[in-house]
Amino acid sequence: MKNKTRNIFFLVGLVFVVLMILTFKVSFRELWQQICHAGYWLVAIIGMWVPLYIMNTFTWRTILLGSGECNIPFWKLLKVTISGFALNYATPVGLMGGEPYKIMEIKPYVGVQRASSSTVLFAMMHIFSHFWYWITALVLYLIFMPVNMLMGILLSIVALFCIAGIYFFVKGYKNGMVVKLIRFVSRIPGCRKWGKKFSEKYADDLKKIDGQIADLHKQNKKYFFISFFLEYIGRILQSFEIFFMLMLFADQEPGVMLFVQSLIILAFTSLFANLLFFIPLQLGGREGGFAMVVSNLGMTIQVSMSISIISRVREIFWTSLGLLLMKVGNKNVEVPQHEEYTDS
């Protein structure tokens, strides 16, 4: 990727991070009190994302191996993964920031088609695992928590949403979804001319990318299930972030029930926040989700405020680090001649 292009991504991400910090409606005094209260637990909460990002990187590498050799150094893939998530967190419309950046960064190593298909597949797998994570939380809620009529209706809506999402992604894995996505964009007012021109110009490339997406599910099921397992387990392990915070702020003893509550809180908060994907850093959505879910579990509003503040501190840390990583370790890579992958 040219430094000029990389700098554009960096500046866009930086603008939204600064905007988020300036609109963070917490006084410095309260913020400092929460950080001091968290103490060494804050280090654990921030540090636990190292193995989570490593698992994300292994997922992406597994997907790349499903379509041929992967000659990208692991540290490079890890760096791009962290920076890609940072851009997704920082920019509006989520995936519109990180995914183009990731494609451009690994294109010199694997070619534009494999870079595009693997990045799309990684994004699909990341979202697909979320649907199963939300289903898991829903089942645990039904088993361990009291359910009244209103909550029953809400859980039914969530279940239908998740089932529809899983069905949509399974269809996408079988047949590819890039061509259909471009067609959908072409019907949006203001994007019709661009969508039509783009689909006509890159028709063959888009079909090949869809073919590579379908191949992972049809012909390389081992890589498909390994990548799904890594992402799903990553979502489960992420629940420990809330687990640590509940031990700290709610003064609860560690145990299975506390972990179940942590998983439910994170699942429904992430569902609520992802529905507001168009907001940079999901401003307000995540905090509202914490308040709604935590209060429904019988905890105080102060607990939800403390959790949301520390979560926001962690997000600012990793988003800032991801943006800084965009500026280091960027050596020019000689673009090789890439052969199209065919399964023999």
Where are these regions (language model features)?
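Transmembrane helix-loop-helix hairpins in multi-pass inner-membrane proteins
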Residues: 1-33, 87-193, 283-344
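Membrane-interface helix starts
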Residues: 5, 37-45, 214-229, 317
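A short amphipathic helical element positioned immediately N-terminal to and/or at the very start
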Residues: 29-35, 205-218
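Alpha-helical segments in transporter systems
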Residues: 45-53, 122, 222-234
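Short helix-coil transition sites and intra-membrane helix breaks within transmembrane domains
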Residues: 51-58, 62-65, 89-100, 275-288
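Membrane-embedded helical hairpins/re-entrant loop segments and their flanking transmembrane helices
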Residues: 57-82, 246-265
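Transmembrane helical segments that form the transport core of multi-pass membrane transport proteins
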Residues: 214-269
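Membrane-interfacial helix-loop connectors
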Residues: 246-309
